[in-house]
């Protein structure tokens, strides 16, 4: 089973920037990374209204596979069940990965000891709310909070600024993965 790192936090707290930073730098170090993002918008679709793939699905296809020279996309039209961690990880079963990074999914990962976590927050209150009910391991807190409380910690968890201290966060992740 793969190592799993979850980046959890409220909307606009810095989750995607954190994922982007980590994926970029972990790949540079030679690691193979998979990622999954929770989308909480009920009307979200990756497909575009009127495009050919949309037309396939609109006609009733349960699964639409798009293939080009450089990319494969699989669109499954289904009402999502109450996803579990294993359901998400099963989506990666056809390949080997050094690390799976999850963005969001707090309700799935917050009480899982086997999932490494990084919390993103806007401010101290936001961080404390997210930390409440989230069990270790929690490597760090990052995101917009680092503009306010850079170099500090909350509940002995370091607050790391990605711009100036990103290497520190990367090292913490590498120690857990390797």
Q: Model features per residue range: what roles?
A:
Residues 23-80:
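N-terminal phosphate/diphosphate-binding loop that engages ATP/GTP or pyrophosphate donors
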Residues 15:
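Conserved lysine of the Walker
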Residues 10:
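P-loop (Walker A) phosphate-binding loop of NTP-binding proteins
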Residues 4:
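Walker A (P-loop) ATP-phosphate-binding motif of ABC ATPase nucleotide-binding domains
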Residues 99-158, 163-177:
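Phosphate/Mg2+-binding loops and adjacent switch elements
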Residues 76-107:
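Phosphate-binding/switch loop-helix module in NTP-utilizing enzymes
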Residues 18-19:
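Post-Walker A alpha-helix
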Residues 7:
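Hydrophobic anchor at the beta1->P-loop junction of P-loop NTPases
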């Amino acid at each position: 089973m793969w190592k799993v790192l979850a980046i959890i936090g409220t909307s606009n707290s810095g989750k995607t920037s954190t994922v982007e930073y980590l994926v970029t730098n972990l790949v540079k170090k030679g690691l193979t990374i998979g990622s999954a993002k929770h989308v909480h918008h009920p009307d979200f679709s990756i497909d575009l209204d009127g495009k050919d793939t949309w037309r396939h699905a609109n006609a009733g296809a349960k699964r639409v596979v798009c293939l080009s020279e450089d990319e494969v996309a699989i669109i499954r039209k289904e009402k999502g069940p109450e996803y579990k961690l294993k359901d998400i990880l099963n989506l990666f079963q056809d390949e080997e990965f050094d690390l799976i990074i999850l963005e969001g999914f707090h309700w799935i990962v917050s009480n899982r000891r086997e999932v490494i976590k990084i919390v993103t927050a806007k401010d101290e209150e936001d961080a404390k709310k997210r930390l409440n009910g989230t069990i270790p391991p929690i490597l760090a807190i990052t995101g917009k909070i680092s503009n306010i409380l850079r170099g500090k910690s909350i509940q002995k968890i370091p607050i790391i600024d990605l711009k100036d201290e990103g290497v520190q966060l990367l090292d913490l992740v590498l120690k857990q993965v390797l």
